[in-house]
Amino acid sequence: PANGFSWADGKGDAVQGNNNESTSEAANAYGAMVLYGLAVGKSEIVDKGMYMHASTTAAFWQYWNNIDGYKNLGADYNNFPAGYTKLTTSIVWASGADFATWFSPAYAHILGIQGLPSNPLILYVGQYADYMKDYVELGMTETLTGKPSELKANEWMDLWWNLWAMTDADAALADYNSVGRNYGAEAGESKAHTYHWLHTFKALGHFKTGTGELTANDPAAVAFDKGDVRTYVVYNFSGQTKTVTYSDGKTVSAAPYGFTIQQ
């Protein structure tokens, strides 16, 4: 697609044209192509999935979040129309955008829908930690304390802990611990996964790859920064040791069929 993203509803039967709501759902589909291609050794599937995932995530930052406008790069880089005051949008149409969802007016849903299903295929959502801080603050507008623990039932408390962990894992984990296991998990999430996600980000810090500042020559390689400590994480789908090189000069010798983690 010309704009870098797919249409969730492409029939063209609405006055506003086609639309797309949850970019993360599309990113999961295209990221799954990458993982499948790596697992079965089909590079053409990997390449196609990488293109579609990268295009979708770039479109997410430009059209849903106006990241260049957020960074104040100038009027020529601003993708939101004059007078639009929200940090983000949720539904992009062929003719515009809505700060809404199809099913709910709650801010927790309007912003949270860009972060599900929650797994490593949506790590791009947290690649700008400063933006994510403001994103979480807006998403929690309708709570008393600005924390996910105050969300109503079915407002995705666990997904919001996961999103918050991308910018402040300590705060997210503290709020999670104030609730314990006494909450209802989002339909596509599990309590075990939320626990793992929060503790992983507490240990690793902020997602560092994704913006182009730090890259790797393998699609299953990422990195995280916590203070002065950088952690490199590689998953090797093959049966042979693989050497992965990062753009900062770090090389990782990844063991077969599993994770290799180095600092």
Task: Give a label for each model feature.
Residues S43-G49:
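Surface-exposed patches in mature extracellular/periplasmic domains of secreted proteins
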